[in-house]
Amino acid sequence: MSHNSFGHLFRVTTWGESHGLALGCVVDGCPPGITFTEAEIQAYLDKRKPGQSKYTTQRREPDQVRVLSGVLLGDDGVTMTTTGTPISMMIENTDQRSKDYGEIARQYRPGHADYTYDVKYGIRDYRGGGRSSARETAARVAAGAIARKVVPGLEVKGALVAMGVHGIDRRRWNWSEVDNNPFFSPDAGSVELFADYLDGIRKSGSSVGAVIEIIAEGVPAGIGAPIYGKLDQDIASLLMSINAVKGVEIGNGFEAARLTGEENADEMRIGNDGKPLFLSNHAGGILGGIATGAPVVARFAVKPTSSILTPRRSIDKDGKEVDVMTKGRHDPCVGIRAVPIGEAMVACAIADHYLRHRGQTGRV
């Protein structure tokens, strides 16, 4: 199985399976001299880890990260400094229940990658989905924590803006609310609505999708490249690589198709600081594949979790028709925990383009 790496200069390789002993990543190309602590990485992993509320899977994983290489430990015993060599990080799996998946060892769960993995490789790890499980994304979040350190002044934030048929009221958007509720919603008024809605979904044994919005501020103007090396192209690619993601848009995205040229174009003036100022940001901070200096805005759609308690028609490996009902512990809305994952992937894309731009032009 190939295609376990992404990035050019800031290159990330992830490894491990849902029910293996551990999973992790190797970050290659991180510049030397960057300082961080394991606690800083852990803070992002804690946002993604399971079992934190009744609205996520009850699999209990501490997701404790260990940095194995690529750093020098400071005299304080806490601060690490990158050496420029590959940074390897590991997260142990501690709460696997492989027996929950015994009945589907030869059955294909509708909506999952069971059939496609089998038809491609002739073998699949049925225990929690193996490599195709969202468990793999913990390693991406760890890599994203390093990526944030590469670009000075970069701030990447995410929020859940829609769940099923319900969306937030953007007039009430408040970033300080995101970490105050189990849905990462920036709208305090939507929390009770989401809770009641998801309670009903969860109790029925079903699932629901979500839309996540990521905003990156402090992105240097000029990073990115035209034609086949676009910043938005790579952001879209990395967001699409996240489990269950079925759509991505940058800036206005599909809404731009409903606007006129006058409505969609971002007009410019010179700001009070003497620098170019965009009067709007319909482009989502990227034009021609190159960052404008305005906030980079991306949204992605996460489909409903395919592991549900309702029997679904399918087939097994022997070609027999079967009814499949998934057991085990699963997220009724996997989009909730996709927020820190989306942040990590956007951070990695920006860090990679930042280093590529610096290498090509000698400036940032």
From Swiss-Prot:
NADP(+) binds at R48. GO terms for biological process: amino acid biosynthetic process; aromatic amino acid family biosynthetic process; chorismate biosynthetic process. One of its GO terms (cellular component) is cytosol. Transmembrane segments: none annotated. The keyword rRNA-binding does not apply. It catalyses: 5-O-(1-carboxyvinyl)-3-phosphoshikimate = chorismate + phosphate. Pathway: Metabolic intermediate biosynthesis; chorismate biosynthesis; chorismate from D-erythrose 4-phosphate and phosphoenolpyruvate: step 7/7. GO terms for molecular function: chorismate synthase activity; FMN binding. Its EC number is 4.2.3.5. Reduced FMN (FMNH(2)). FMN binds at R131, S132, S133, N243, A244, G288, K303, P304, T305, S306, S307, R329. It holds the Pfam family Chorismate_synt. Keywords: Amino-acid biosynthesis, Aromatic amino acid biosynthesis, FAD, Flavoprotein, FMN, Lyase, NADP. Belongs to the chorismate synthase family. Homotetramer. PANTHER family: CHORISMATE SYNTHASE (PTHR21085:SF0). This reaction introduces a second double bond into the aromatic ring system. HAMAP family: Chorismate_synth (MF_00300). This is Chorismate synthase. It comes from Brucella anthropi (strain ATCC 49188 / DSM 6882 / CCUG 24695 / JCM 21032 / LMG 3331 / NBRC 15819 / NCTC 12168 / Alc 37). The lineage of its organism: Bacteria, Pseudomonadati, Pseudomonadota, Alphaproteobacteria, Hyphomicrobiales. The gene is aroC.
